[in-house]
Amino acid sequence: MSQNHILPQNSITNAVLEWNESGTPVSNDFDDVYFSNDNGLEETRYVFLQQNHLPQRWQEYDQRRFVIGETGFGTGLNFLAVWQWFKEFRSQYPDAPLKELHFVSFEKFPVTKSDLIKAHQAWPELAQFAEQLQEHYPAAVPDCHRLVLEDGMITLDLWFGDIKDCMPQIWMDDKGLIDAWFLDGFAPSKNPEMWNQTLFNNMASLAKKGCTCATFTAAGFVRRGLIEAGFDMKKVKGFGHKREMIAGTLTERTTKANHEVWYARSTKENITDVAIIGGGVASAALATTLIRRGVKVSVYCKDEKSAQGASGNKQGAVYPLLNEKFNSLSRFFAPGFIFARQFIDQAAKHVEFDHDWCGVTQLKWDEKSANKLNKMLEGNFPNELVSSFDIDKTNQMVGLPINMESVHYSLGGWLCPKQLTRGLFEHLSNNPLFTLHCDSEIIALTQNEEQQWLLSTDSNAYQHQAVVVANGHRFTDFEQTKDIPATPVRGQVSHIPTTESLKNLKTVLCYDGYLTPENSKHQTHCIGASYDRRDLDLAFKESDQIENGERLRKCVPNEVWPNDVDTSDNQARVGIRCASRDHLPFIGNVVRFEEMQEEYKNIYKKRHWLREAKDIPVYEGLFCMLTLGSRGLSSAPLLAEALASQIMGDPIPLPNSVLEGLHPGRLWVRRLLKGKPLDI
């Protein structure tokens, strides 16, 4: 397909490759090789690692995480090579301050996984690294895909899309993010669209002061463009038969932060100690990613055991929430779901929990649902993420007669949230950095003169540098978070015995409710769930139990097997979800509501007001991770990764425009921008 062929923004076009007589992949679009026919690995090491003074710089580096930016991912050769060298460095210098390598790369036309595997056969010495990359290589969905490898020692942010669109979407503060640039890609003569002043300026914008840069080309316009952007560039000897290449350093940073002040995100310097309030899957995911970064984590759970709230169900469906628009909803949930699969699969290597990647089938059970799902399919997502099924295919996939059309999420499935949450906490308990406080209900948050947070129970007070409120609908317990515009939603899920017909259900079935396949260990299914806004009653309701069964029979009215669903033994579980008006979570700094209301009262007079605009007022060191709703299993892992990245000052794996859609102050800001009162 031509590189100029324009598709909807939810779609990314895979590269079309041919293989030359040397077995090297060649791009059809650019008529250029992905790496040198001769000694491609050695060329990578010379051009990009050695000319960026690696690994020597790592020995002298005094920060926790070193960040490399790359302009063309291709087959991942540069990434694999630097991964190999960094792992050797960590082995040789285990006590060095530098613990983690973060690699940020861009690719407009990602190679397919099968082509990736074939290309990697050229470098057998990199096989152990290549296999891990292949295992978690993402579907062709736009924006950032985070891969966490080597238990957090290696992080890859792989941005799918045009680099000129992606680079400005990376959240950045005044200090910049990148320590070294690998300016790679097809030759400037083959890909002139990429090699331009916009690229060079964006590289400088994302770079820290002292950031180095190296590229294989010695083209004069590239050297002049990088110098104009602020890099001090020099010619150096090229690799092998190539006479010259260029390398250099950014001597001064002039670029400022790249986000609106009312969507600012801040953190405290050198955070080493974080408290998390809440005992569910959100807290478990966040604790996991913070511990990987060497942070001391204390989780406070009000119940005798974790996962007693909304994360306590026996079976929960895992699939993305998508729409046809290229907006915050799809742009978060598509990569969020892909990352959730990675997180859960990695957890399964050391945590035991019931789960089955059997797929999720969503029925077009009436005209409204059919219109909604057909509209969603116009988003042109890859089939690997979601596909359309006719009646025959639906019946075949479900394993029971349905006789209606559907959409199918082949990567989806179900898992036991309670087992996953408790298993993650149990695994973390082996780490001296982690403490789980059960039976510890926090009743108040206060900040002392040293800007430390005090968490008070009835009998104790605990002091921490930073706090994350992740306690679902109980966010109203605290003065600082009580005004967040979120709604509690009661849900009752029924546990039903399997039958000869229900045993045939092969996939999670979604309609105006959901039914899971049998958990063979217990010979039961879950069917649900009721949805009662602002209802906090945790008592069992027989009417909800009956309704859970009737909802399936209403949506699949012409088949016999739904009559086998028997909820009469009243086995059920009630939980309270927490939801936002726009169906997106809140993650980030907790906003000082009254101060923001006063500071931003004239925000709608934007032109005049912006002259004196200040960052949105927040509680320093106080964060939230709330309103995951009924999609917490699909969203919590990436939300945790994004929030941990913000807290620790790492690159954030979400576009700026999506981060705006997740900001805890967004609903207030939107009203103020329109000159409306804050009555939400």
UniProtKB/Swiss-Prot annotation:
Disulfide bonds: none
Keywords from the named record: Cytoplasm, FAD, Flavoprotein, Methyltransferase, Multifunctional enzyme, Oxidoreductase, S-adenosyl-L-methionine, Transferase, tRNA processing
Positions of the UniProt region annotated as FAD-dependent cmnm(5)s(2)U34 oxidoreductase: 277-680
Highest taxon, organism lineage: Bacteria
Pfam families in alphabetical order: DAO, Methyltransf_30
Reactions it catalyzes: 5-aminomethyl-2-thiouridine(34) in tRNA + S-adenosyl-L-methionine = 5-methylaminomethyl-2-thiouridine(34) in tRNA + S-adenosyl-L-homocysteine + H(+)
Necessary cofactors: FAD
Subcellular location: Cytoplasm
A GO BP annotation: methylation
The enzyme's E.C. designation: 2.1.1.61, 1.5.-.-
Family statement: In the N-terminal section; belongs to the methyltransferase superfamily. tRNA (mnm(5)s(2)U34)-methyltransferase family. In the C-terminal section; belongs to the DAO family.
Function of the protein: Catalyzes the last two steps in the biosynthesis of 5-methylaminomethyl-2-thiouridine (mnm(5)s(2)U) at the wobble position (U34) in tRNA. Catalyzes the FAD-dependent demodification of cmnm(5)s(2)U34 to nm(5)s(2)U34, followed by the transfer of a methyl group from S-adenosyl-L-methionine to nm(5)s(2)U34, to form mnm(5)s(2)U34.
Descriptive protein name: tRNA 5-methylaminomethyl-2-thiouridine biosynthesis bifunctional protein MnmC
Lineage start: Bacteria, Pseudomonadati, Pseudomonadota, Gammaproteobacteria, Vibrionales
Name of the gene encoding the protein in the UniProt record: mnmC
